[in-house]
Amino acid sequence: GLHKIIGFARRTQGLIVAKGNPLGLQSLTDVARTGARFANRPLGSGTRVLLEDLLAQEGLTGQHIAGFERDETSHTAVAQAVVSGAADTGLGIEMVARARGLDFVPLVDERYHLACLKATLEQPATRALRELLLTRVWQDHLASLPGYSPMHSGQVLAMSNVLPWWDFTRPKRPSAHRKKP
């Protein structure tokens, strides 16, 4: 096909909670059931979209979550809200939870890929990036970050494997030189 996918990384998102997880939160259903105060991300952010999808999967809406309307600007700000006691939990990444001495309850793994035109795969910049992503140094560094891991880093992947729902076929146009019946 015209486009190619390059593997990059895997990242885990979950509930950022106080050390020891005093409310025993293991799911968004637990957050709703306990009335835990939630630090949210802004409407339109990737984490907010993910949260709304996860809530729907559990048969919940934002109305079930105390503090759903409280927006924080970043994963770090969510963690800080938990540290300060302004919130009991929020959805975010493990790395910021660990950096603030908090605990983390994993909920979902996200896959990150880079997309490019097939024609750019052998251009010097793309080749250099792919070579870097394939190095043990890069993969070890990524694996050293809490909640991150290499996932096919630097490998060219078939779009049909990464995005099985995508239909890359286009209907054929009638040829202009064909005779009409």
Roles of regions detected by a PLM:
Residues 61-74:
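Short beta-strand-to-loop elements that line the ligand-binding cleft
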Residues 1-11:
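A structural signal for short loop-to-beta-strand junctions that line the ligand-binding cleft
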Residues 29-49:
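Short loop->beta-strand "edge-of-pocket" segments that line small-molecule binding or catalytic clefts
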Residues 1-2, 23-29, 136-181:
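N-terminal hydrophobic or amphipathic helices and topogenic motifs
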Residues 27, 77-78:
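Short acidic active-site motifs
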